[in-house]
């Protein structure tokens, strides 16, 4: 902050927060990462409820790559066709919600490992759509001089702030729920 106040840093410009797209992009990333923290429930369910070992749990994570590929293709094709951002964002959050509903109604009742991969693929598809769109949305009307600042904001919110808040919320919820059983 000292370097930014004295204007010795060309990388972090606090004027970037005056742009609505950057503020909305940071808020969307924060919301996305808080929602994405619910993925730890998949690992808890797989480890505790289904008694999977670490290798099976890690191989379940490999199915994320399929979801990321599907999400990237959907985002590029529909974005290239000029579909409005609000519909693409709604589609991404729909996939995240669909994954949670699938986990609740399909996987939880049956407890079959093979069905768990579909929930992982659906969630990864929604996450990839939202990752791509949030970055593209903030870059839409942003002057080039704020690009490095936007990248710094995006990485800070995505890697530090969002997962910390989401992890704290879901850990407290999980701990509170365990006290009743």
Regions found by a protein language model. Give the residues of each.
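Membrane-helix boundary/linker segments in multi-pass transporters
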Residues: 1-57
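C-terminal module of multi-pass small-molecule transporters
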Residues: 61-181
């Amino acid at each position: 902050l000292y370097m930014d106040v004295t204007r010795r840093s060309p990388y972090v410009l606090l004027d970037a927060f005056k742009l609505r797209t950057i503020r909305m992009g940071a808020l969307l990333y924060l919301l996305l990462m808080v929602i994405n923290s619910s993925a730890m429930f998949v690992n808890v369910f797989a480890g505790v409820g289904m008694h999977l070992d670490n290798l099976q749990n890690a191989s379940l994570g490999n199915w994320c790559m399929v979801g990321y590929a599907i999400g990237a293709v959907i985002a590029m094709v529909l974005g290239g066709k000029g579909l409005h951002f609000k519909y693409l964002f709604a589609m991404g959050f729909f996939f995240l919600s669909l994954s949670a509903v699938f986990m609740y109604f399909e996987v939880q009742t049956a407890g079959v490992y093979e069905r768990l991969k579909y929930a992982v693929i659906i969630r990864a598809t929604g996450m990839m759509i939202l990752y791509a769109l949030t970055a593209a949305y903030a870059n839409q009307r942003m002057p080039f001089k704020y690009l490095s600042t936007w990248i710094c904001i995006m990485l800070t919110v995505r890697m530090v702030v969002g997962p910390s808040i989401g992890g704290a919320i879901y850990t407290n919820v999980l701990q509170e729920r365990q006290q009743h059983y």
